Amino acid sequence: MKFFLDTANVAAIKAINELGVVDGVTTNPTIISREGRDFETVIKEICDIVDGPISAEVTGLTADAMVEEARSIAKWHDNVVVKIPMTTEGLKATNILSKEGIKTNVTLIFTVSQGLMAMKAGATYISPFIGRLEDIGTDAYQLISDLREIIDLYDFQTEIIAASIRTTAHVEAVAKLGAHIATIPDPLFAKMTQHPLTTNGLKTFMEDWASFKK
């Protein structure tokens, strides 16, 4: 399984990338806007830090606008993946871009049908949203399981990026269900390394060692 960082904070990306567990980065207009910096500059800086797929999202609403923007974004770096919203216009754009060899990440996936349509259109990645589905009482884990089953059954080359990840339990569950990737907010990475028994155990080891060395 691969881990992507779901942030555009360059300092956080640098720090977490040193752990050796980051395979890529995802961003969206909301995440970029929080940084208050030029979109292209931020994406290029991220590409210089992480050697893996870096998702950058279009803001156009028509297929023509998305394609034009995507072609420009794709030129920023070889690792850039263009994020496209799951709409009919988005599917048209994905189809065109996939034929041009531009990698796409179709986002805002909430149903199996949406995921299947994106796969058929040639999406490199699809991003089903875990937390947001749970917010409305929908079984997000079943969606991940169903999408993976379809990919394996029909040999689609699309990979699942489990998004809207909010807890360590989310990461653990989607890993067991076969999501190819989990995209994780930077604060959650720290939580994934921690447990009270680990902290207490290390404290005991150090105390015992200090006593032994006296």
Curated annotation (Swiss-Prot):
- What reactions does this protein catalyze? D-sedoheptulose 7-phosphate + D-glyceraldehyde 3-phosphate = D-erythrose 4-phosphate + beta-D-fructose 6-phosphate
Q: Which residues cross the membrane?
A: none
Q: Indicate the enzyme's highest-level EC class.
A: transferase
SUPFAM superfamilies the UniProt entry points to: Aldolase (SSF51569)
The record's subcellular locations are: Cytoplasm
Task: Name a biological process GO annotation.
Answer: pentose-phosphate shunt
Lipid biosynthesis as a keyword of this entry, yes or no, is no
What's a single GO CC term here?
cytoplasm
| Active site annotation, chain numbering | 83
Q: Which UniProt keywords apply?
A: Cytoplasm, Pentose shunt, Schiff base, Transferase
One term of GO molecular function: transaldolase activity
Q: Which pathway does the protein contribute to? A: Carbohydrate degradation; pentose phosphate pathway; D-glyceraldehyde 3-phosphate and beta-D-fructose 6-phosphate from D-ribose 5-phosphate and D-xylulose 5-phosphate (non-oxidative stage): step 2/3
Q: E.C. number, please? A: 2.2.1.2
Is Zinc one of the keywords UniProt gives this record?
A: no
Q: What does this protein do?
A: Transaldolase is important for the balance of metabolites in the pentose-phosphate pathway.
Tell me its family: Belongs to the transaldolase family. Type 3B subfamily.
Fetch the HAMAP family from UniProt: Transaldolase_3b (MF_00494)
The protein depicted here goes by the name Probable transaldolase
Name the source organism.
Streptococcus pyogenes serotype M2 (strain MGAS10270)
State the organism's lineage. Bacteria, Bacillati, Bacillota, Bacilli, Lactobacillales
